[in-house]
Amino acid sequence: MGKAKFPRQLKDNEAKAVARTIRVSPQKLNLVAAMIRGKKVGAALADLTFSRKRIAGTVKKTLESAVANAENNHDLDIDSLVVAEAYVGKSIVMKRFHVRGRGRASRIERPFSHLTIIVREVIEKVEVA
């Protein structure tokens, strides 16, 4: 697999933050990422604050980093930001041994994940009556 030959280029109204090697399985992390996908940043932060999932704090920290990148690096208005993309990638799998009875051992796999969050500035159209 590895890196993509032509990674996706960010548009002028987008900002990105990446959290690498997070100690959680991609399946569990994707549940939280799907929860914020497509929402306004304020609503997504509120959802993550009150989520009972263990990994929600790390996702919130990454989202706050994306918002800070949008504000400081791209001069975007943070009140009109939307979570455009939130996707999860598979990272390494750490192998450990678990001692069992009768001199046996079994293998435990501890998966890691990558998280990428892209926020986009959306200008809402005002209808004139």
Swiss-Prot record:
Keyword Signal: no
UniProt key word RNA-binding: yes
GO MF annotation list: rRNA binding; structural constituent of ribosome
Pfam families: Ribosomal_L22
InterPro entries xref list: Ribosomal_uL22 (IPR001063), Ribosomal_uL22_bac/chlpt-type (IPR005727), Ribosomal_uL22_bac/org-type (IPR047867), Ribosomal_uL22_CS (IPR018260), Ribosomal_uL22_sf (IPR036394)
GO biological process: translation
Alphabetic keyword roster: Ribonucleoprotein, Ribosomal protein, RNA-binding, rRNA-binding
GO cellular component, one term: cytosolic large ribosomal subunit
Purpose of the protein: This protein binds specifically to 23S rRNA; its binding is stimulated by other ribosomal proteins, e.g. L4, L17, and L20. It is important during the early stages of 50S assembly. It makes multiple contacts with different domains of the 23S rRNA in the assembled 50S subunit and ribosome.
Family under the similarity heading: Belongs to the universal ribosomal protein uL22 family.
Quaternary context: Part of the 50S ribosomal subunit.
Name of the protein this chain belongs to: Large ribosomal subunit protein uL22
Gene: rplV
